Amino acid sequence: MEHGDRHITVVDEQGNEQLCEILFTFESDDFGKSYVFYYPVSAEAEDEDGETEVHVSAFIPGDENEEGELLPIETEEEWDMIEEVWNTFCAEQEEGEE
């Protein structure tokens, strides 16, 4: 994972690079980890309904000249916490649109 201001380059298991935009990051004191919500910048990332799939990973930030590292979500408890954060984010976005 390479960091830009609001973009990261994600490398998949096949070695393909994909430019993604960071939606937001947060830290969890309960799990002692940082998390990032991101989505692919390319138009091909949209599904048949025109929706863009958002991904989430734990991450270890890199130093100034080093790449960071994306990590998988490991437990059901982490997924529950992430879902709660996502639902709060979506509710706040909807309130802002009204």
Swiss-Prot record:
Taxonomic path: Bacteria, Bacillati, Bacillota, Bacilli, Bacillales
Pfam families cross-referenced by the UniProt entry: DUF1292 (PF06949)
Top-level taxon: Bacteria
UniProt-recorded name of the protein: UPF0473 protein GTNG_2486
Disulfide bonds: none
Native source species: Geobacillus thermodenitrificans (strain NG80-2)
Family annotation (NCBIfam families): PRK13678.1-4 (NF010217), PRK13678.2-4 (NF010221)
Family label: Belongs to the UPF0473 family.
